[in-house]
């Protein structure tokens, strides 16, 4: 009996310590996210150039728009593909009109800092912010402006709403669009003040051409309208005249609406907005939820957010809308949070969660861009750059952006994961995504083992035309560590890799083709997206002639150009054929 019991214990321990397995199959010809560079957006706090009570900067910038010396080595080379503004400023009454004008020191004071600093002129204002984005190489079309939606003439139910309120809010928002986008030719589309002329006098004669405008920040929060459908109806009532006013100034802009992150079902903000007159009349461009996952709860895990957002992205696509992830970061549910609570969201634990989240988001072909919350204030609760005890630190979650941005190539492609479940009951232990260059000459695979206990054996399939160039593991010594360790690794005899718990495997491949194949491929190569398609299938280049057939080889339609309308095709499998290519796609009505 004792022998049998000992054998049972040995078998049990061997199972507990068994190495888990994960397999990834890649289809480089099937695009998921058309521009995966937009995974690396950030939200920027408009108060970043203001001074604290001791007269020193509380943010990243001096009032003149230069980075403070301590921030230069941390942030001057930081990768930013898209940005959201004014961040936390919107919650404390930031007024863009008071943030423009020269000299900057003569601008009216704004009280935006609470106990962090006195009322003062916002010298690093809207124009200075736009100059910074230009210096970073960003197009104004990749700036996402958050506008206040509360009018100070109304007595709002909550002091948080009242704190955001500004005078004559409808005109205020319309004036901002005119200042940003109207040509300086006397057209003055809003009448009254010629804001384009004022912009020109402030040193920027040409219109910025900002496309993305979001209505509010988190209007679904309990201290604003609340997460009920009645709250959503109130939100829609408030923003409709604002939307009409700003579209009258510039009909080409793209308007996004905030929505509750994890609402599911028919009686939700998601459903209410998607079925609203604003959506039906084409006045809005997309929905913009926020995500603050934590792995400690069953409904707050990254996997839960990815599942919900996958469904939401598909629902948006059915209504002809996009999804933009306004903000995300590791959640900090503790109230009030300790310094350790704040830090771990930015340390290695928060980094693993963030990479897991980004890999999940990269597979949503109707997701346009993602922003991290929040940059600009190193003493804030969420601080990817931290100021503590007189020291500025680039936290691991920000270090990881610097490491991953060059590796996330032009498109994410279809990556099918088969992973053992996590030791905590998560549906997977390892999450993987793959990224290719425009001409398919490069392929990078990023696999994150988000499990805190299990090691995984990892295998990649679908890469027979690629040669491995580099392989490394990114890891740390503990969830609260702030140093990222890079280790060069090699596959085992079977071509498999080992991914330790809470670590990231990066594989870099180059295409293995001869010179003739290389030239031929560059000439003939193109990609199709989204796949599955609903109403339209896009091509990454203009085609002189193409034919669409069903899976029996029967011709369904033909044409030329950079897209094909697919709304009238029945759900199923189809093939797009050109002289040199044949690509499979699905219709998913």
Where does each model-flagged region fall?
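Bacterial Sec-dependent N-terminal signal peptides
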Residues: 1-21, 513-517, 582
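C-terminal outer-membrane/trafficking sorting elements
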Residues: 7-10, 517-589
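N-terminal catalytic cores of secreted or lumenal carbohydrate-active enzymes
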Residues: 19-282
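Noncatalytic carbohydrate-binding groove/subsite architecture in carbohydrate-active enzymes
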Residues: 180, 191-199, 225-357, 364, ...
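Aromatic/acidic polysaccharide-binding cleft in carbohydrate-active enzymes
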Residues: 325-431
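Carbohydrate-binding surface patches
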Residues: 425-465, 502-506
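Solvent-exposed beta-hairpin/edge-strand motifs
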Residues: 462-483
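C-terminal beta-strand-rich structural cap/linker in extracellular carbohydrate-active enzymes
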Residues: 488-512, 574
């Amino acid at each position: 009996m004792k022998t049998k019991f000992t054998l049972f214990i040995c078998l049990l321990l061997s199972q507990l310590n068994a190495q888990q397995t994960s397999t990834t199959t890649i289809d480089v010809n099937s695009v998921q996210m058309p521009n995966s560079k937009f995974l690396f957006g950030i939200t920027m706090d408009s108060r970043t150039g203001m001074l604290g009570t001791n007269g020193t900067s509380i943010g990243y910038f001096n009032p003149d728009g230069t980075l403070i010396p301590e921030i230069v080595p941390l942030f001057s080379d930081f990768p930013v593909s898209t940005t959201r503004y004014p961040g936390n400023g919107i919650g404390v009454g930031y007024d863009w009109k008071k943030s423009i004008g020269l000299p900057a020191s003569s601008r009216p004071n704004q009280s935006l800092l609470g106990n962090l600093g006195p009322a003062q002129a916002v010298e690093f204002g809207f124009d200075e912010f736009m100059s910074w984005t230009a210096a970073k190489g960003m197009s104004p079309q990749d700036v996402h402006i958050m506008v206040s939606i509360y009018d100070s003439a109304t007595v709002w139910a909550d002091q948080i709403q009242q704190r955001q309120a500004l005078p004559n809010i409808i005109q205020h928002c319309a004036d901002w669009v005119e200042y940003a986008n109207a040509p300086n030719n006397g057209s003055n589309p809003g009448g009254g003040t010629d804001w384009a002329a004022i912009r020109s006098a402030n040193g920027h004669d040409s219109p910025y051409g900002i496309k993305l405008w979001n209505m509010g920040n988190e209007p679904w929060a309990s201290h604003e309208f609340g997460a009920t459908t009645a709250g959503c109806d109130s939100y829609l009532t408030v923003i409709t005249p604002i939307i009409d006013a700003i579209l009258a100034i510039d009909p080409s802009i793209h308007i996004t609406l905030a929505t509750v992150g994890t609402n599911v079902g028919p009686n939700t903000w998601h459903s209410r907005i998607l079925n609203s007159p604003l959506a039906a009349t084409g006045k809005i461009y997309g929905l913009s939820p926020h995500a603050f996952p934590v792995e400690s709860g069953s409904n707050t895990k990254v996997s839960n957010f990815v599942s919900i957002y996958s469904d939401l992205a598909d629902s948006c696509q059915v209504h002809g809308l996009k999804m933009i992830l306004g903000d995300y970061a590791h959640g900090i549910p503790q109230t009030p949070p300790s310094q350790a609570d704040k830090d771990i969201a930015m340390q290695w634990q928060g980094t693993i969660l963030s990479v897991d989240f980004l890999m999940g988001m990269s597979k949503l072909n109707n997701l346009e861009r993602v922003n991290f919350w929040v940059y600009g204030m190193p003493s804030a609760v969420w601080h990817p750059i931290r100021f503590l005890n007189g020291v500025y630190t680039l936290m691991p979650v920000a270090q990881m952006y610097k490491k991953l941005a060059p590796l996330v190539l032009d498109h994410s492609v279809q990556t099918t994961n088969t992973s053992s479940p996590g030791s905590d009951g998560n549906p997977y232990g390892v999450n993987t995504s793959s990224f290719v260059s425009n001409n398919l000459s490069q392929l990078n695979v990023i696999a994150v083992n988000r499990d805190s206990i299990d090691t995984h054996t990892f295998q990649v399939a679908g890469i027979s035309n690629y040669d491995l160039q580099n392989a490394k593991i990114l890891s740390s010594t503990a969830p609260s560590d702030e140093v990222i360790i890079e280790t060069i690794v090699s596959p085992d005899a079977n071509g498999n890799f080992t991914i330790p718990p809470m670590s990231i495997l990066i594989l870099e491949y180059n295409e293995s083709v001869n010179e003739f194949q290389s030239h031929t491929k560059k000439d003939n190569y193109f990609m199709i997206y989204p796949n599955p398609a609903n109403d339209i299938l896009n091509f990454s280049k203009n085609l002189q002639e193409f034919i669409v057939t069903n899976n029996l080889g029967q011709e369904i339609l033909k044409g030329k150009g950079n897209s094909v309308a697919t709304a009238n095709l029945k759900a199923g499998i189809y093939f797009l054929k050109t002289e040199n290519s044949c690509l499979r796609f699905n219709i998913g009505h």
